[in-house]
Design a protein with these regions (language model features):
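Carbohydrate transferase catalytic cores enriched for Leloir-type hexosyltransferases
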Residues: 1-123
Length: 123
């Protein structure tokens, strides 16, 4: 049986806990139960990820070489997706400009769209 290969950009786990980390922890704690999907969880601090999701045959942890978001999005992630023959990738807020597979983009907070008067133009 061929497994679906799903890359998850987990860089948000490298910072302070927030709504995005709660969302990812919740959804992927359930999805990793599906053994027909192989998950590639990527972050700079993979030790933190392994404490959350544990070790299973269908999980691979990938350590980013940098915390720099520009280098990660422009170079590192596209290279990792190609190297691991990823079919789908899940990102938060921003996707790499060079898309090497189908992708899922989650935008968690869109208050700036409903109430632009409360946010600076640069937001």
């Amino acid at each position: 049986m061929n497994k679906v290969k799903l890359f998850v950009d987990c860089h948000v786990f490298d910072g302070n806990y927030q709504g995005t980390t709660t969302y990812l922890k919740g959804i992927y704690s359930e999805l990793i139960k599906f053994k027909n999907i192989h998950f590639y969880f990527a972050s700079y601090n993979t030790d933190a990820l392994s404490k959350i999701f544990g070790y299973q045959d269908n999980i691979t942890y990938i350590k980013y070489s940098t915390k720099n978001k520009f280098l990660r999005l422009l170079f590192e992630i596209p290279k990792l997706i190609s190297k691991n023959k990823i079919q789908y990738a899940h990102f938060q807020y921003v996707v790499p400009p060079l898309k090497k597979c189908k992708y899922i983009l989650t935008i968690h907070d869109v208050l700036f769209l409903d109430f632009p008067e409360y946010f600076p133009l640069t937001y």
